[in-house]
């Protein structure tokens, strides 16, 4: 299905992107945002969808079919490290921003939601724990792993998170794009208000409190 318009949740790992993406997807009319362009996810999806390996154009078309709701809205998540790789793999005409060329090719009439987290220390700890335990999301009732802390690796991820956020900031400034800015801290404490602000930005209907989809994954209490 070819989308009429689209949006991208531009983010870094452990910023609440699944919470925002699942809530938007569960409305039934705000696309089906997911990590379609994560390196491992991309390989798995390409195999599942029968898309030739390395054919980015064919893969994008397959994403359109999976991520577009019947009203023609396409939604996707995009981490900075995946975006950085994608834009480096393109060879646009001279003077054309490679990242913007990819966005225009993959996301028709795109709008951008910039999701970030103020507390970088907690972000780094959460990222490290998820990477070590493989628990990127906790279902209700699921116990979180508690591996022995490795401070040096946590610090490295805090710094990498800062670099990735700066990457998005600089790219938005360079391209003149003005995204809808969302903070994880606000999303975690007042999901309805934040999601409705995003829906308004996307020119989509608001949610009533009774229609707010349940949370699929619970928050890790200390990260």
Question: Model-found features: residue ranges?
Answer:
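PAPS-dependent sulfotransferase catalytic core
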Residues: 1-72, 217-219
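Aromatic-acidic/polar surface patches that form glycan- and anion
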Residues: 2, 12-13, 68, 157-161, ...
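Short, well-ordered beta-to-alpha junction loops that form the rim of enzyme active sites
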Residues: 12, 78-79, 115-117, 183-185
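Surface-exposed, flexible loop/turn segments at secondary-structure boundaries
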Residues: 17, 38, 81, 120-121, ...
